[in-house]
Amino acid sequence: MRIKQLIVIILIILVVLTALLPQLTHANAIVNESQMDKEVRQGMHDYHIPGLAVGVVKDGRIVFLKGYGKADDTGREVTPETPFILGSVSKPITATAIMQLSEQGKLRLDEPVLAYLPWLQVDGPTGGREATVRDLLRQTSGWSTYDGRAIMAAQGHTAEEIMERQGKLKLERQPGERFGYSNVNYMLLGAIIEQVSGEPYAAYIENYIFQPLDMTDSYADPSTARENGLASGYQTVFGKLMEIKPDISPALVPAGYLAASARDMTHFLLSQMNGGQYRDATVLSAASTGLMQRYEAGFPYGLGWFTTSEWISHGGDAENYHADVMMHTDGSWGIVVLMNTNDVLLTSLYGNGYGDLSFRLLEAAGNGSLFSSLLIEPVKFGAIAPYLNLGIAALAIWLIWSLYRLVGGPNSARHVSKWLIVRGSLLTVIDLIVPLLFLLQFPVEMGAPWRTILRFVPGWGHALFIIPMLFIFVWLLEGLLLFYRLRRTDRGHEVIEGLR
């Protein structure tokens, strides 16, 4: 009897292995691992990426999943289970939660935001129409990209606290008028999830998205993620990669600070590509998933996704992480790429090399058949660090010379002349007007306030803020000292009288 049972068990195992073998062989045949390795290594070298994880799905299956490089300064290796901060790839997950609550009848997409967040203060052109939940999802609320970047450095534990400290945010355009990407929208959606569900955002996401999708290495609380192996994020500080751990407000997690592994994100991606279903779990109906991904000609955003006629995607940029998620509209191919670095300055100057790498990895996975016509020469990061450091050093030397000139300037009446006044006027332009204009205009050009620039461009950002401030301080001291010297000399009185 025992022999018969043993034979039955062996036969069952053989049947299962026989069924799995073609799938495994097919998966290996689909993706050329050596080519993927080559592309990843080259990209990590070109874009100074310490660690990276990538997952590829094809026709409802994971066909490639691998980690590369280091997760932190201890040398811990990146694996497919290593969590990374997702940046704005958090937004499709937040949007999924909103769509769940809509399906349950707990909220209506076309209801005004104020119906759920009565504390919200809105100023600006409304055109007689209030922003709705759908406007937040589609990025058509009217809030600006600038304000969305400003809140990333704001202080506050909740969305209400952050909005109170920001003051009454003014709408840039009428709600529903046109697309305008802003992190404000998804911060408020996180607050709506809490209000409607009666649960903290983190608990809701973990219970109703992460658990059903078997996302066991994903976290809606950055502190918990750090305790469970989160890859350390790296930023460039004066040209050197350094581990940076900025404080993160829980209110901003829905817009940009969820954490997940590449393995887990392939589960989420598969659910989005399969009408809201992953294995036996259904987190969303096919109708709601289709609504999230629907493409409208001339409009770049669905409900939580960037959309085109062929591709559905989202990128994410936190201070020290980058992420990309892409899937084909026919449900065939999809990719997840997670990186533990971000250099806003280099991507602003040279182009989004990180996103370029993600495209190339998907193209390599598809053996050059997906969108090669869209790929041009790879983005290359220039060696700008030495020049920036040299420029900042020159400004620092100039500042020191200004201080020396101030201390070692004329102390007697015979040195006081009208020429000194003329020179003072010229220095006013150099030491006051130019630095002041720079401090005011640079945030406008960057599209973010100084406090956000300092978080995303540490080192160089701090130097570009502090040095102009010091020049202005030197100008004030120089003016006070000059006035004092003029007042205490007869020649100075003559000069002052002559200028009247």
Predicted regions span which residues?
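Catalytic loop of the DD-peptidase/beta-lactamase superfamily, centered on the K-T-G motif
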Residues: L24-L52, V56-K58, E199, P246-R500
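Short, conserved catalytic-motif segment at the N-terminal edge
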Residues: I30-L86, V122-P125, G167-K168, A225
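Active-site helix/loop module of the DD-peptidase/beta-lactamase fold
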Residues: I30, G51, P80, I85-V89, ...
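Hydrophobic secretory-pathway targeting helix
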Residues: R2-A29
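Catalytic-site signature segments of enzymes, centered on catalytic residues
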Residues: T82, T145-S232, K240-T266
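Short glycine/serine- and small hydrophobic-enriched flexible loop segments
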Residues: M99-E103, G190-Q195, H267-N274
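Extracytoplasmic/periplasmic, Sec-exported soluble proteins
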Residues: N28-Q35, D46-H48, V78-E81, I85-I93, ...
